[in-house]
Amino acid sequence: MAFSRCKFCGDSGVFPFPVISKKGVTEYFRCKECMAISLSDKEHLPLSQQLARYRQHNNNLNDFGYAHFLTSFVYHTFSFLAPFAPSSILDYGCGPNPALIDLLHLVLKRQQDHGSFTKSTDFNGIDSVEKCIDFLAFFLSYLPKQELIYGWDPFFSPNGKKEPANLVLCLEVAEHFGNPWEGFSGLAQSCTAEGYVAIGTLPIPDSIVSNMDFKGWWYKDDKTHVSFYTEKAMVECGKTCGLRYMGKASPRIFIFKKLGDA
């Protein structure tokens, strides 16, 4: 089905942006105003297939590449927010294997072991999972108690969410939002007033102008990825639910602050 309004900014200037391949035509739509891209609702995978795909994700802390990816997200987010020290942290959309929570718990334990870790400020020198933990243990001046670092996922941990946290981490989740406004509303409801939301997702590169450009972009090939953002689309989604855009912590990390009266 065609969208009468953009799912991201609400503008009426939405046009077909199909991807044509040997397998056929996959329907996407793009907004002329915010330039975000949505997969047509009729192309969304059934829930059972989405769950099967999520279970295939290799989100394992023993994988150095993935551990380094998580470390980068934490490092850039906390660097941007400094000197803010969260009193609670929620991993929103933590999946079947809450690796980000596990990493922060390991960092907290390392800190509690009376500083028995290698003290390094060289992010580029990290070359092992242990060094990921050591680096964050030294870099993060404060973490809340373990029970105040928790996760929630609509499929795998629907009862995990406790009280709203004052730091909500949302890594590789926003691209799965079938309805971005609803997704952002969930993030806002999970955050305390004056708290922060950090969203990690790969934005649409400036080089993607035509649907032929988009066809070659690898990030769309995961069929559970249905929403693709520009920075402007991020800003507009935040406006719908009282999340004020603060800027980018890195090219793929977007920081918001929950307004006190939202």
Regions found by a protein language model. Name each.
Residues V209-W217:
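Juxtamembrane/transmembrane-helix boundary motifs at the membrane-water interface
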Residues F177-G178, C191-A193:
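Helix-to-beta-strand junctions that scaffold the AdoMet/dcAdoMet cofactor pocket
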Residues M1-L167, W181-G186, G200-T201, F214, ...:
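Conserved N-terminal segment of class I S-adenosyl-L-methionine
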Residues S227:
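Post-transcriptional modification and biogenesis factors for structured RNAs
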Residues E194-L202:
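Conserved beta-strand signature within the Rossmann-like core of class I S-adenosyl-L-methionine
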Residues L169-P180:
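A short SAM/SAH-binding and catalytic strip from SAM-dependent methyltransferases
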Residues F156, E175, I204:
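Active-site micro-motifs of SAM-dependent methyltransferase domains
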